[in-house]
């Protein structure tokens, strides 16, 4: 026999108290406290010593078998010990895993039980609250009932007084009737007899009433008054007749009031019935409470059954642990095979095994003792608590039953007493009626009786007061009982809390089991758990002491209640004795009054028959109604009991259904919650992703907006810089225009002097021919048109100080400058300089062609004609606006041209003025064809500028509509003229503005030449002539030609605006086409020169009023001299 086997045999502990008192045995689960003890160490088999103290139980036959087998050899035993230790280790590990699994299951079950327990506690608390409410309602109903009883008693007293008054009235009426019936003589005789009787009985009255001497005098007075009344009877007869009539009327009124009072009594009885019904309801509530108490007892029984089931489960877990031990043995066999491979670990294992053996023995000893102590203590505590709880419940039940029975008996007794008192009062009323009938005869006796009655009434009132005080005491006792019930409920709640604490302790013990089973891994934690268990035992001992103190306090309170009950019983017995005495006294008085009433009934029976019949009918109705009420109360009590039983059953069924529904609801809610949680998590993830995307998009948009804002700011800065540059350029242009004006004036003066000198030479006979030859050679004087060299009015208006300047124009100009892409902001200041360079550095001048690159505002036909004398060369169309790609000049070229312009500004101005004032000269001979490369280049430029002509020609045409009708007609004539003869003139007709646009396209005919000198188209054709006649291949000259085209277009626009503003007439020069290129050029030149001189003179007279357009000799040599001077 091992300690484990002994511990397995301990299945349950029965409490002898429960067994003795009710025959109930409470089985407690050992699985919550007792862990499965490990097997005994193998050292017990070697005979070295047994530490368990169970050697007496061992069988000697087993030892013999061991010796026979050879198990007692030390070597084999050591090996077996090692194997057993390894097996034990494996078994312990398996047990640990099994116990952990079981503990997990137990924890799950524990959670379920905790939830169920919480639900039951909630139901119990609700039931307690309902009980408290019902108790408060019951107390309130009791107080109301008692108040109503007092009110009813007061009402009864008032009704009795009314009845007495009515009886008095009836008596008086009866007396009047008797007096009316009897004759005066009979009345006198009766009066004498009454006086004699009064005198005879006065001695008896005097003997009885020594205590009231004052009333004796009153009796003597009344006797004398009776004597006087006898004498006055005759006088009263007439008065009584009149009073009879009044009394009849009063009788009718009294009967009406009596009926009203009867109705009031009926209503009062109905109220009493309602009160009785409320009392029955209160009884029902009390029965319900009893049923709830019974339900609680049933629940406790169920808990006991659950504990038994737990014990069974523990046994099952023990069997499972044995199976796990078998599995562990199998694993140990496998470990033995592994031990052979790991000899190095055996030394450490042996040392650890010795330590584990010692530690196991200590643990086994401690566990065996401590666990058994804890189990015994807990079982004893639980048994004592259960017994106390059951005893308390039984005592409370008994006390409640007794109190209810007492209350019911008291109510019934009170009812019986009330009925008896009513009957007695009725009898007393009858006796008093009889006595009042005899008042006239026996007033002295009646007064004495009245005194005695008054004294008795005082006694009764004192008794009633005492009864009311006793009732108050009873109420206070009831309240104290209710307080005790509340305390009992509190104790129950505390007991439930303690049960919860015990369950928690059981849980902690289970946790300790787990920790003990894991002692191989958690040896250090075992000590702390043992300390915790000790602390817990101390806590349990303290709780036991507290419970004992509470029990003692409860017993003391119960003893106090018993004492109060004993005092109450004594008082009750005393009250019952006093009641019996009072009833005896009432019986004696009733018998005496009956004897007196027997003498008077004969006289009053006839008059009181009607009243008795009414009273009897009323009493019969009252008794019938009371019996019916009692039967109803009994039936209602039985119904209430049945209803309570049905309520119990329904409540049990509802509780079971609620539990099932709650479990189902919990499962459904958990599933729904998981579904919702997953859905919400998915939604949250999607929202997060969407938010991240939106944030990324917002960040990208924000970065783009920031970049755009930065670009806009940069662009604004550029625009501001460009506007500043534009304003600076405009200011520079204004200064240049002013300088040019001054130089023109100087040049005009020099020109006038030169012309005067030429005229003087012409007048000379010998020098005239030379001068004519000089003039006809190349020199053509420019016209002194000062308006054309001035900057345009729009440019002057756009100056910073002008009033016509606008921001929109500045912004447009700046944007156009940006679009050009190559220093477009500097071009307005370079236009005039580039014009000067175009005049000076013209390639036609180097080859000594007769091309006049004069003023772009007023081109004469002579220069155009000279340029168009080359055969096989097509005129190029002029681009009337600046293009950023083709007509723009690079910055390096502009710098180069600026440097060249600064050197040759004076010479360019001279040539410009000469060409502007020169008339249509005589055409020269055609030179050889130009270089084909230049023509190809100009053709490409023509193609690139073709597309832009259509959109920009209208700009110049609109500006020239004011005074350019002749120009337009002249261009159309030159465009459609075909082949003409030499010096062919065309009549110029005025044309309406906007009729036709300039036709600037290149003509297919070779010799067709446009010859407008003064307008934009003429300027463009001059540019084309200059580009076509350029024989040089230098890139500098080509760029100069391109810049000349752009600058001349600008100056043409300015000249047109100036001419339109100044209304200056424009001379249309008829073109001349050279069809013949004969070698006899001298004759043709002479004739053409004469014609040209005449035409130029006519044109100059028409336009300017000057004769400066005639050819003069010596102009070609001056031009050459200026060219050589400037180039060198």
Curated annotation (Swiss-Prot):
Region named Disordered: 1-22, 38-59, 806-829, 847-1128
Family: Belongs to the CRWN family.
Biased composition (Polar residues): 904-914
Disruption of the gene: reported phenotype: Altered nuclear morphology. In plants lacking both CRWN1 and CRWN2, moderate dwarf and leaf-curling phenotype associated with endoreplication and strongly reduced nuclear size. Plants lacking both CRWN2 and CRWN4 exhibit slightly smaller rosettes. Plants lacking both CRWN1 and CRWN2 exhibit markedly smaller rosettes. Plants lacking CRWN1, CRWN2 and CRWN4 are extremely stunted and set few seed.
Location within or outside the cell: Nucleus membrane; Nucleus, Nucleoplasm; Cytoplasm; Nucleus lamina
Motif residue range(s): Nuclear localization signal: 966-973
Comp. bias regions, Basic residues: 917-927
Gene: CRWN2
BP terms from Gene Ontology: nucleus organization; regulation of nucleus size
Keywords assigned by UniProt, alphabetized: Coiled coil, Cytoplasm, Isopeptide bond, Membrane, Nucleus, Phosphoprotein, Ubl conjugation
Membrane topology category: Peripheral membrane protein
GO cellular component terms listed in the entry, alphabetical order: cytoplasm; nuclear lamina; nuclear membrane; nuclear periphery; nucleoplasm
Primary residence: nucleus
Compositionally biased residues, Acidic residues: 1012-1025, 1076-1108
Biased composition (Basic and acidic residues): 847-858, 870-882, 939-950
Coiled-coil region list: 73-365, 391-730
Role this protein plays: Component of SUN-protein-containing multivariate complexes also called LINC complexes which link the nucleoskeleton and cytoskeleton by providing versatile outer nuclear membrane attachment sites for cytoskeletal filaments. Required for nucleus structure organization (e.g. size and shape).
Residue(s) carrying Phosphoserine: 842, 908
Protein name: Protein CROWDED NUCLEI 2
Tissue expr: Expressed at low levels in roots, leaves, flowers and flower stalks.
Subunit structure and binding partners: Core component of the LINC complex which is composed of inner nuclear membrane SUN domain-containing proteins coupled to outer nuclear membrane WIP proteins, the nucleoskeletal CRWN/LINC proteins, and, possibly, KAKU4.
Crosslink position(s): Glycyl lysine isopeptide (Lys-Gly) (interchain with G-Cter in ubiquitin): 340
